[in-house]
Amino acid sequence: MNECVNKLLHLKFLFYFILGIQKRPVFFVASRYGRSTTYDESLKSRRIFIVPRNEHFFLGSRYGKRSGKYLCLSREINKLIVRKRLRNNDKERTPTLSFITKHFLMRNT
């Protein structure tokens, strides 16, 4: 039984080590906002786990937050804005030679 538990613990350690999810050391913050405090107050300070959050960075996200359903919506809105600008630019653009030629040929056929 003891041997089984040891094997299980060893496998669990290897699993977490391979995945890179092993526990990291804890960083102790002596005072809040970097202000100087007495020793008793610094003991009351909370401990902070400093862990790199690389899994939270995705393309198209802001400030390392996960990209949710709103990312697709914003992309669609951006596409619509670009299309609208292109249509407006076509209307405001002065006719070029190819534009005039196409309309001339279409009128004569």
From Swiss-Prot:
One of its GO terms (cellular component) is extracellular space. Its main location: secreted. The keyword Cytoplasm does not apply. GO terms for molecular function: receptor ligand activity. Transmembrane segments: none annotated. Residues 36-53, 67-109 form a propeptide. The modification Tyrosine amide is found at Y33, Y63. It is found in: Secreted. Neuropeptides RYamide-1 and RYamide-2 are ligands for the G-protein coupled receptor RYa-R. May suppress feeding behavior. This is RYamide neuropeptides. The gene is RYa.
